[in-house]
């Protein structure tokens, strides 16, 4: 007799072992029809897996997140089979599931063309119609290497050869086609359905290393049903329309260029948004009891070795010698004794150095230390994406040094501050995730137990709902992630709160406790916006460039119908600027409709229009962005109303 416990807590008993599909049928035939896999003690397995012991069991259906991921996994295999049928001689490499879809990398002499995607998609539909049975086989590792070499799959053979000798490997057979894979998979290709779409072509280096050969990557998306697929494709279309790079050009906010990959050239209008954000955050953290600091960009590699970052982040750090030749000809005569210096990829170790200056007492805690810290990370060229993924970034970074007893209170205060900031930015409904210890980590299990428990208890005390993200914590401590949804439904991970018992120990930070002895402070790493670059990119796309008045780079443009009103327009401009409004003047000899249209395209919230009559009466006609109507007001009243609207939320 085996006892199988379901997620609702109920237990079902079976006299003989049975596979996942039979177990689903024993509950309900309708459930068995929806089933795509089974979870046994939290591990995803094929439906054909036999359950022969007591276990916690969950039937995975296609509509669940795990089910959708499985569909995407199978879609990548069906795509690979279709590619090899249509383009014989193509080698397959890897094909993982990614957010909202999947991809597969192929090795092929000739490049794929955009029109090939429709052919591949059509063949995928045919493979689904064939309803090919998918079965798992276990092979000897060496035999698998030889087999894949024999059929010309050099990349697969290389992957298998990296598995320790003597181990077995799993291969999935899909009709007459097979692939190396851990699984699990659907019972057959017919279970996949046809709610998939191939989306784009790209290049990718084998194993992500630019020294290796270039492969061809095909991206796709797959969903549980056609409605979900259509909704996603509509969202993608809307996202393309809102692309911050396109809007950034149209609004003259910033640009990027090859000579400074991953770094942003901020134009005056874009820099105004940056400054408005930075000043807003500075006021909020000042009111919350933070002190602001500034730390060096370059630090000795020994410093990073001590902190533990050298071993973890070395390949993502920009490293330079502290002895630089004066000319290119002098380069070969470096002494070889130069120290290696790293441009900081993060601020936390430097903040500990400030904390360590002078003796700290328990009375000094909590100490909340903030920095708009400019950091550099050596991101791969192919990963860079506008403002969303850069090499040079500025973070609204802060570290809270506190006692263990203060963790709950500090977490509560931070969450309240963060949610207030997001609300001011127009975001509501923050989703929380608690990311726990990764496989590669610093510190002992005992330390991690303490850190994870402290953060979990603080969240429960706040009454906040949260999900666990096993294995996704930082290498020095568990992490609380804050996710937002934008205007078109996309989720963005922005704020973080990371609990760290490790770094203060490594860098010997201490304070004198009430007992007169030295103690290690707890270190809370926290950010609200994340990087300002990325947050501005998100704001651009969320608002489609139509920023709320207080963030708009140009809040008002003054323009004229005839040149007779030019002196009055100049007077209006000065009054607007005196009221603290970011205003510009347009006295061009163009038709008023043309000028209004141009400034509307530039997303200016308010256009002040003046003609001869307005000049004589001391009034102004106001056209608001997105409205076809004009409102005529006394100039002073209009400026007062606009100034109130332009006031940052924390100053109202």
From Swiss-Prot:
Give the source species: Parvibaculum lavamentivorans (strain DS-1 / DSM 13023 / NCIMB 13966)
Name the EC number(s): 6.1.1.3
Q: Where is this region: Catalytic?
A: 243-548
Q: Identify the coding gene.
A: thrS
Q: InterPro entries, from UniProt? A: aa-tRNA-synt_IIb, aa-tRNA-synth_II, aa-tRNA-synth_II/BPL/LPL, Anticodon-bd, Anticodon-bd_dom_sf, Beta-grasp_dom_sf, TGS, TGS-like
Q: How does it assemble?
A: Homodimer.
**Predominant location category:** cytoplasm
Pfam family, any one: tRNA_SAD
According to UniProt, the name of this protein is Threonine--tRNA ligase
């Amino acid at each position: 007799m085996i006892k199988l416990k379901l997620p609702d807590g109920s237990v079902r008993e079976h006299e003989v072992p049975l596979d996942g599909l039979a177990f689903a049928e024993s509950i309900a035939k309708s459930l068995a029809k929806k089933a795509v896999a089974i979870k046994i003690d939290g591990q995803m397995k094929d439906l054909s897996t036999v359950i022969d012991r007591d276990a916690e069991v969950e039937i995975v259906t296609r509509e669940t997140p795990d089910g959708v991921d499985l569909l995407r996994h199978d879609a990548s295999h069906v795509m690979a089979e279709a590619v090899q049928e249509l383009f014989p001689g193509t080698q397959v490499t890897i094909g993982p599931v990614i957010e909202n879809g999947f991809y597969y990398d192929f090795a092929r002499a000739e490049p794929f063309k955009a029109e090939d995607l429709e052919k591949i998609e059509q063949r995928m539909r045919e493979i689904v119609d064939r309803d090919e049975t998918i079965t798992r086989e276990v092979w000897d590792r060496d035999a698998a290497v030889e087999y894949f070499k024999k059929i010309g799959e050099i990349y697969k053979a290389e992957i298998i050869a990296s598995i320790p000798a003597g181990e077995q490997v799993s291969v999935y057979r899909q009709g007459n086609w097979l692939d190396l894979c851990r699984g699990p998979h659907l019972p057959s290709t017919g279970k996949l359905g046809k709610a998939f779409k191939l989306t784009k072509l790209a290049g990718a280096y084998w194993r992500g290393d630019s020294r290796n050969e270039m492969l061809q990557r095909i991206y796709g998306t797959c969903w549980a049903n056609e409605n979900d697929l259509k909704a996603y494709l509509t969202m993608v279309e809307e996202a393309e329309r809102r692309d911050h790079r396109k809007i950034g050009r149209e609004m003259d906010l910033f640009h990027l260029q090859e000579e400074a990959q991953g770094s942003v050239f901020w134009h005056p209008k874009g820099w105004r948004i940056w400054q408005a954000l930075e000043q807003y955050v500075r006021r909020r953290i000042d009111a919350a009891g933070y002190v602001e600091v500034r730390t060096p960009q370059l630090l000795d590699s020994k410093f990073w070795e001590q902190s533990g970052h050298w071993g973890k982040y070395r390949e993502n750090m920009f490293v330079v010698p502290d002895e630089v030749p004066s000319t290119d000809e002098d380069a070969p005569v470096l002494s070889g004794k130069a120290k290696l210096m790293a441009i900081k990829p993060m601020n936390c170790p430097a903040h500990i150095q400030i904390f360590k200056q002078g003796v700290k007492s328990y009375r000094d805690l909590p100490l909340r230390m903030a920095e708009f810290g400019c950091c550099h990370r050596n991101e791969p060229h192919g990963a860079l994406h506008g403002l969303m993924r850069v090499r040079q970034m500025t973070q609204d970074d802060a570290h809270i040094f506190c006692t263990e007893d203060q963790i709950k209170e500090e977490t509560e205060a931070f969450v309240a501050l963060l949610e207030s900031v997001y609300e001011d930015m127009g975001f509501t409904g923050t989703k929380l995730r608690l990311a726990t210890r990764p496989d590669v980590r610093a510190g002992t299990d005992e330390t991690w137990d303490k850190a994870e428990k402290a953060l979990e208890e603080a969240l429960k005390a706040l009454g906040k709902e949260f999900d666990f993200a096993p294995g996704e914590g930082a290498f020095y401590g568990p992490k609380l992630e804050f996710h937002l949804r934008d205007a078109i439904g996309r989720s963005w991970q922005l704020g973080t709160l990371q609990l760290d018992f490790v770094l203060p120990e490594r860098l010997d930070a201490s304070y004198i406790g009430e007992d007169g002895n030295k103690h290690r402070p707890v270190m809370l790493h926290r950010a609200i916006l994340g990087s300002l670059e990325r947050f501005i990119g998100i704001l651009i796309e969320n608002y489609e460039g139509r920023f709320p008045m207080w963030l708009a780079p140009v809040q008002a443009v003054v323009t004229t119908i005839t040149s007779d009103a030019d002196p009055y327009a100049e007077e209006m401009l000065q009054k607007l600027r005196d009221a603290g409004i970011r205003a510009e003047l347009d006295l061009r000899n163009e038709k008023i409709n043309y000028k209004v249209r141009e400034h509307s395209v530039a997303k200016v919230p308010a256009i002040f229009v003046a003609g001869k009559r307005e000049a004589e009466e001391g009034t102004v006609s106001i056209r608001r962005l997105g409205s076809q109507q004009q409102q005529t007001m006394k100039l002073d009243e209009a400026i007062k109303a606009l100034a109130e609207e332009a006031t940052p939320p924390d100053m109202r």
